[in-house]
Amino acid sequence: MAEGVPRAGSALPAASLSSLPLAALNVRVRRRLSLFLNVRAPVAADWTVLAEAMDFEYLEIQQLEKYADPTSRLLDDWQRRPGASVGRLLELLAKLGRDDVLMELGPSIEEDCQKYILKQQQEASEKPLQVDSIDSSITRINDMAGITIRDDPLGQKPECFDAFICYCPSDIEFVHEMIRQLEQTNYRLKLCVSDRDVLPGTCVWSIASELIEKRCRRMVVVVSDEYLQSKECDFQTKFALSLSPGAHQKRLIPIKYKPMKKEFPSILRFITVCDYTNPCTQNWFWTRLAKALSMP
């Protein structure tokens, strides 16, 4: 693997990853890859860019576009070609700048690879193989239990929210205003604000994915010039869009609260914006936003 390529984990050397076939990756990992790569966006490399890096020709990519899950089909076709491996896939994702995918799926990929190696060893020996050190590394504890202030540490009753707030540190004052207007009024909404509600010590990508997908009914994006420079906000926005392609579930709500020098992000242009900068509609702003967040 090339220098700087994030590996699935230190337990497996790069040479092992390079020799492991894609068959080592299970359905769950493949589905998560599809969530990241099926979204067509000009600001991030999608499955078509990955296909080109895998040396698929234009006509082949056109054929893949006919499938509901082109990423899954791409991986199926590529794994039959020479040189396809888990390590090569990670290397290509790194070259395409998809560090968000590598950070989020790294632990799951390592787990799949360990299981695959263990299974191969068992089949080769033709008898059950008990390796405590490997078994213990495969057994995963629910590391998403106890990630927020009011979470049940045992994971029996995870804390849920009306909306996840995607914001930059420089926009924290407006987030405080959101808390005052939406939580401390008759609306009584429950917002997930990372700096206030999330406990330290866990991967930021994993926490964001868990909260956006499973714990929050909506996501509010505080758009600003600083937002456009944030990799964390970029990941959160693309992940939320991947859960609701075309905004059919009205899951994501962009907010423009101050004038911008830079162009509004194209990935959000097709979604209705709550514009706090328009003095003609400012009196209706909080009512509209609260109503949108209260919808089932």
From Swiss-Prot:
The keyword Phosphoprotein applies. Disulfide bonds: none annotated. GO terms for molecular function: TIR domain binding; Toll-like receptor binding. Its main location: cytoplasm. The modification Phosphoserine is found at residue 244. The keyword Heme does not apply. It is found in: Cytoplasm; Nucleus. InterPro entries: DEATH-like_dom_sf, Death_dom, MyD88_Death, Myelin_different_resp_MyD88, TIR_dom, Toll_tir_struct_dom_sf. SMART domains: DEATH, TIR. Residues 32-109 form the Death domain. Gene3D superfamilies: Death Domain, Fas (1.10.533.10), Toll/interleukin-1 receptor homology (TIR) domain (3.40.50.10140). Residues 159-293 form the TIR domain. Ubiquitinated; undergoes 'Lys-63'-linked polyubiquitination. OTUD4 specifically hydrolyzes 'Lys-63'-linked polyubiquitinated MYD88. Deubiquitinated by USP3 that cleaves 'Lys-63'-linked ubiquitin chains leading to inhibition of MYD88-induced NF-kappa-B signaling. GO terms for biological process: defense response to Gram-positive bacterium; defense response to virus; inflammatory response; innate immune response; MyD88-dependent toll-like receptor signaling pathway; positive regulation of canonical NF-kappaB signal transduction; positive regulation of interleukin-1 beta production; positive regulation of NLRP3 inflammasome complex assembly. CDD domains: Death_MyD88 (cd08312). SUPFAM superfamilies: DEATH domain (SSF47986), Toll/Interleukin receptor TIR domain (SSF52200). Pfam families: Death, TIR_2. Homodimer. Also forms heterodimers with TIRAP. Binds to TLR2, TLR4, TLR5, IRAK1, IRAK2 and IRAK4 via their respective TIR domains. Interacts with IL18R1. Interacts with BMX, IL1RL1, IKBKE and IRF7. Interacts with LRRFIP1 and LRRFIP2; this interaction positively regulates Toll-like receptor (TLR) signaling in response to agonist. Interacts with FLII. LRRFIP1 and LRRFIP2 compete with FLII for MYD88-binding. Interacts with IRF1. Upon IL1B treatment, forms a complex with PELI1, IRAK1, IRAK4 and TRAF6; this complex recruits MAP3K7/TAK1, TAB1 and TAB2 to mediate NF-kappa-B activation. PANTHER family: MYD88 (PTHR15079), MYELOID DIFFERENTIATION PRIMARY RESPONSE PROTEIN MYD88 (PTHR15079:SF3). Adapter protein involved in the Toll-like receptor and IL-1 receptor signaling pathway in the innate immune response. Acts via IRAK1, IRAK2 and TRAF6, leading to NF-kappa-B activation, cytokine secretion and the inflammatory response. Increases IL-8 transcription. Involved in IL-18-mediated signaling pathway. Activates IRF1 resulting in its rapid migration into the nucleus to mediate an efficient induction of IFN-beta, NOS2/INOS, and IL12A genes. Upon TLR8 activation by GU-rich single-stranded RNA (GU-rich RNA) derived from viruses, induces IL1B release through NLRP3 inflammasome activation. This is Myeloid differentiation primary response protein MyD88. The gene is MYD88.
